[in-house]
């Protein structure tokens, strides 16, 4: 029968083995990119993983540790000089000789970023909307029934569909963001009034956009 002491020693051994395995995992492996990855590929991989594991969105016990690992990898690989050092010396380039990052590292200071910082480079909203808080962002992306407020619908109509959101840079974002309250239909109407033969007829031209398709038709009603 195992004694408490032997169980404790076994647990310590497992923990040490786990840490050794994690330590041997390269930053490229963490982000899931090849060593020859471009800056754009690295940035795209980071945003995808950061959104998946951010503690505010992912409530699993290991989400915070995973997110920190992802952020640390990105901090190094997104900087040309740091990446060059890492490619040459590996993890030892940023440790203090004890297997820990040096106290002078900027990682601790740069780690505490929020969703605004995470998405600001993606141009989700207009220029004025990039400065809005994380709560504002979450309110727009929560699942809502069709009876959402007109204010929220207005913002959805301002969503940028042209030449950016669904290109190769953001193809993963399209897959990750799905919510029932979203309708990519944008309508612009102009109403004109024509009178003839003593009757009144009201016509309006409706331009309707669904995805990348735009259709225009005239809707008339009257006596």
UniProtKB/Swiss-Prot annotation:
**Major localization listed first in the record, in broad terms:** endoplasmic reticulum
Give the sites modified to Phosphoserine: 133
Name the GO terms of the biological process aspect.
B cell differentiation; ERAD pathway; negative regulation of IRE1-mediated unfolded protein response; positive regulation of immunoglobulin production; response to endoplasmic reticulum stress; response to unfolded protein
Q: Name one Pfam family in it.
A: DnaJ
User: Does this UniProt record's set of keywords contain Signal?
Assistant: yes
Q: Where is the signal peptide?
A: 1-23
Q: What keywords were assigned to this record?
A: Chaperone, Endoplasmic reticulum, Phosphoprotein, Signal, Unfolded protein response
Indicate the segments forming the J domain, all copies: 26-90
Q: Where is this region: Divergent targeting domain?
A: 91-223
Per the record, its GO cellular-component terms are: endoplasmic reticulum; endoplasmic reticulum lumen
Localization per record: Endoplasmic reticulum lumen
Q: Which GO terms describe its molecular function?
A: misfolded protein binding; protein-folding chaperone binding
What's the domain remark here? Answer: The J domain stimulates the ATPase activity of HSPA5/BiP, while the divergent targeting domain is required for efficient substrate recognition by HSPA5/BiP. The divergent targeting domain specifically recognizes and binds to aggregation-prone sequences.
Q: How does it assemble?
A: Interacts with HSPA5/BiP; interaction is direct. Interacts with ERN1/IRE1 (via the luminal region). Interacts with DERL1.
Please report the name of this protein according to its UniProt entry: DnaJ homolog subfamily B member 9
Species per Swiss-Prot/TrEMBL record:
Pongo abelii (Sumatran orangutan)
